[in-house]
């Protein structure tokens, strides 16, 4: 995602988020997340989803591992996971903005079967959560 695309997505998330919190969109399973301030560590269970940060920074703890991600990076949770999340960069002028897309594992499995693409596991023994660049 280039800088112009990131800014455009940030403007859209800000526009469709009336205040702090998770905001549903007209598309089922797609949510906009906005926070105007950093928060304390918040225990929760991440469900299978893809989260793309477009503004701000977040830290997620899974047992003894720390996953930190920032604009133009994403976090994927592939299974239900007990984590502790914390937004570590946000303000009223530059709120934390994130696009969350829920993953339907049943649909993904069907899609993989229909495409008949070969499965290549290049990373053995990986956790059910990972961060990458958009």
Please report, for each region that a protein language model flagged, where it lies by residue.
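N-terminal regulatory/effector-sensing and dimerization cores
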Residues: 23-121
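Amphipathic alpha-helical segments enriched in hydrophobic/aromatic residues interleaved with Lys/Arg
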Residues: 2, 111-134
């Amino acid at each position: 995602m280039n800088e112009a695309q990131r800014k455009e997505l940030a403007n859209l998330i800000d526009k469709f988020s009336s205040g702090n919190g998770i905001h549903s969109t007209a598309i089922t399973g797609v949510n906009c997340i906005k926070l105007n301030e950093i928060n304390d560590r918040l225990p929760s269970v991440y469900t299978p989803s893809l989260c793309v940060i477009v503004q701000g920074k977040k830290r997620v703890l899974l047992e003894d591992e720390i996953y930190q991600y920032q604009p133009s990076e994403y976090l994927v949770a592939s299974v239900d996971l007990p984590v502790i999340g914390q937004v570590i960069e946000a303000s009223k002028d530059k709120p934390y903005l994130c696009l969350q897309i829920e993953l339907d594992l049943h649909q993904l499995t069907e899609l993989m079967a229909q495409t008949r693409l070969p499965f290549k596991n290049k990373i053995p023994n990986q956790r059910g959560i990972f961060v990458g660049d958009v």
